[in-house]
Amino acid sequence: MQQDKINLLGLNQKAIEDFFISIGEKKFHARQVFKWIHKKGVIDFDSMTDLGKNLRNKLKENAEIVIPKVVFNKASKDGTHKWLIDVGGSAVETVFIPEEGRGTLCVSSQVGCTLNCSFCSTGKQGFNRNLSSAEVISQLWIAARTLSKNNGEHDFSVTNIVMMGMGEPLMNFENVVPAMDIMMDDLAYGLSRRKVTLSTSGVVPRIYDLLEQSGVSLAVSLHAPTDSLRNEIVPINKKYNIDELLEACKLYAEKGPHKHITFEYTLMEEVNDNLSDAEQLIELLRSREVPAKINLIPFNPYPGTPYRKPSNNRIHRFKEFLQHNGFVTTVRKTRGDDIDAACGQLAGDVMDKTKRKERYLKKLGDKNAI
């Protein structure tokens, strides 16, 4: 019985070296192939010209390099790109945001999301599955190739990665960490730990694991200054409360690549955007002695949501209050909203990307058939 071929795309350098040893080849060939895939964008073994013919044939027998299909690539009038990527019958989205001197790629980690935050459109799709490490890194591979063609130079690029797309990355730890290893490998994309940011809603045990095994920059989706409010809008808070979360954040700031944690705070009118909320947020972060930067995200409305985006005056007032109290505070610019690529909008053109309804109807049909 023929064994399934291994997809080399998602293997970090250590794993691809182990694979080459397992087929009786030397480690340095693994590094050659690794570089061909990620540095040069070559996925055909026969095009890897510094490999011998016998090795190329052996690789074709035992391995493959599979890139998911791009369903579409949309470009916004502000230069933002959004890719819809087919991952075995479901779909995920990846967004590239160009700014002066940098280009940020927002990468998805799951098909849908398990956490069901009340204000997030992605969570309304339900959850299908975790992405493989190959599916995670393929988003960067696809973006790098597309952007180099658009700009006529291979090195235009993605300078920063944010694991802030669809899904909770720390709920897919085993696949996200190897993919981030590839992002930071000098034989691949060569990004520093400071340039790769993982955003979590607060899977506290995995924050400690992340510090030990990866140490990329950390952002935390806080969104509320009290447990009572956070329990309502970020349900994982019922399992890992704010005290536990900030204790992990404090250690991460001490040991991680940045000496601060970025706290993301989605502003929703009359929910968490009052000055009393800002006062509580300041007291919370000061009392826990967590070095913090605060990134305010004006809510992006989507069909059926009960929440509203605050007025510009309310956003400005909240930001000014935090700044006057000594906190570095930014307001995230809304980018790509004309192609549903703005933060919280990654449910996009095909609302049921996780096939939730389809799976439910099939299950119902199977039960009726019994």
Swiss-Prot record:
Query: Mind listing the GO biological process terms from this record?
Result: rRNA base methylation; tRNA methylation
Q: Which GO terms describe its cellular component?
A: cytoplasm
Q: Which segments constitute the Radical SAM core domain? A: 99-337
UniProt source species: Francisella philomiragia subsp. philomiragia (strain ATCC 25017 / CCUG 19701 / FSC 153 / O#319-036)
Name the chain's protein.
Dual-specificity RNA methyltransferase RlmN
Q: Please give the catalytic activity noted in the UniProt record.
A: adenosine(2503) in 23S rRNA + 2 reduced [2Fe-2S]-[ferredoxin] + 2 S-adenosyl-L-methionine = 2-methyladenosine(2503) in 23S rRNA + 5'-deoxyadenosine + L-methionine + 2 oxidized [2Fe-2S]-[ferredoxin] + S-adenosyl-L-homocysteine; adenosine(37) in tRNA + 2 reduced [2Fe-2S]-[ferredoxin] + 2 S-adenosyl-L-methionine = 2-methyladenosine(37) in tRNA + 5'-deoxyadenosine + L-methionine + 2 oxidized [2Fe-2S]-[ferredoxin] + S-adenosyl-L-homocysteine
| Primary localization | cytoplasm
Residues noted as binding [4Fe-4S] cluster in the record, renumbered to the chain? C113, C117, C120
What keywords are assigned to this protein?
4Fe-4S, Cytoplasm, Disulfide bond, Iron, Iron-sulfur, Metal-binding, Methyltransferase, rRNA processing, S-adenosyl-L-methionine, Transferase, tRNA processing
Covalent S-S links between cysteines:
C106-C343
Note from the entry: Reaction proceeds by a ping-pong mechanism involving intermediate methylation of a conserved cysteine residue.
| Gene coding for it | rlmN
State its cofactor.
[4Fe-4S] cluster
Xref: InterPro entries: Aldolase_TIM, Elp3/MiaA/NifB-like_rSAM, Methyltransferase_A, RlmN_N, RNA_MTrfase_RlmN, rRNA_lsu_MTrfase_RlmN/Cfr, rSAM
Q: Where in the cell is it found?
A: Cytoplasm
EC class of the enzyme, as a word: transferase
Q: How does the cofactor bind to this protein, according to its record?
A: Binds 1 [4Fe-4S] cluster. The cluster is coordinated with 3 cysteines and an exchangeable S-adenosyl-L-methionine.
Could you say which residues bind S-adenosyl-L-methionine here? G167, E168, S199, S221, L222, H223, N300
Family under the similarity heading? Belongs to the radical SAM superfamily. RlmN family.
Do you know which PROSITE patterns this protein is assigned to? RADICAL_SAM
